[in-house]
Every structure is written in structure tokens, then in C-alpha cells.
Amino acid sequence: IEIAYFDRGPIMEDELITGGYWSVYYYEGAIYGTEITRGLDILKLIPSEYLSENEIAAAALAYPMIGHRRAFNPQQQVPMDWPASPEVARAYIDQLLRDKAIDEDTADQIIEKLDQVKIEMEMGGNNRLARQINRFSSSVEGLNADVQTKSRLERLDATLKGISESLRK
């Protein structure tokens, strides 16, 4: 999926010198582009109307589903996964809000609980908070929504369940 357009312009104004990117990959919060003539470009994403700060934070948490979590070779095209974390849940909430698939009150209630997770995890967990977060689980059965919205709701649900499970003492 294209999320941005980037062009540095001609290498020389008056002479044809070919160049361009061999490859561009996202890894741990940065976009790495290997340009044929100029070398390596490293770009950071910034929030905009199309991409929230929460989505950027969640993207930085992605890890390979196969093998070591920090080993990454884009040529292997290993599928990526995300941990069940408040950052990931907030990213799904931002996407659902942007698409008007959930109401702001529900989003605020979930975020209020997510704000407590880190502290409670550092203290060894909290069964009560786990139950409260688990109550937000949603069913997409019979929901009149497109495939992408249903997928985001299912992933938010799975993420909230994972957070809830990690909070249990």
C-alpha cells in the first residue's frame, strides 16, 4: 500500500544520470530506502490526517512472526505481527474513529482503561482491570460494515483480549 510519495528530484539538472530506489522498507519506526546513486535515505513518519501518532507507535512494535523478533531481512518477506499492547489497541481505535466505525464515547472508555495498563503491569497485573477491558469485546456477526472495518474490529477485540490476559495475576 502506498502511504506517501517521495522524490529527491534529478541527480543532475543538465545531464541524464539514472537512479532511483532499489528497495524501500519500514523497520522499527523508520523507512529505509536504498537509492542507486545517492545511497541510503532514512525517513521517519509523522502524524497527519491519514496516520495517527498511535498508528506510528504501533507500527514500530511489529515483529517477524517466524524466527527471532529482532532479526529482519526484507528479502525473506516474513509475515509481521504485533503484540497485544495498548499502543496497538489505540491504533485500531484511531482507524475505527477515522472511519466512523465506533463512537467517541466507546473509544474514550476503552482508552481510559488502556491508560492504566502499563502501571498495573508494572505492579504485577490487575484482575479487575483485566475484566473491565475484556468487557469491551465486540462481535462483528451481522454488523453492516465493510471487510476492512470488520477486520479492524476483530483485531481490536483480539488485542484487548490479549491485554486482558496479560493483566491476570
Locations of regions flagged by a protein language model:
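Feature marking well-ordered beta-strand scaffolds used for ligand recognition
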Residues: I1-L96
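Soluble extracellular-acting proteins and domains
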Residues: A57-K169
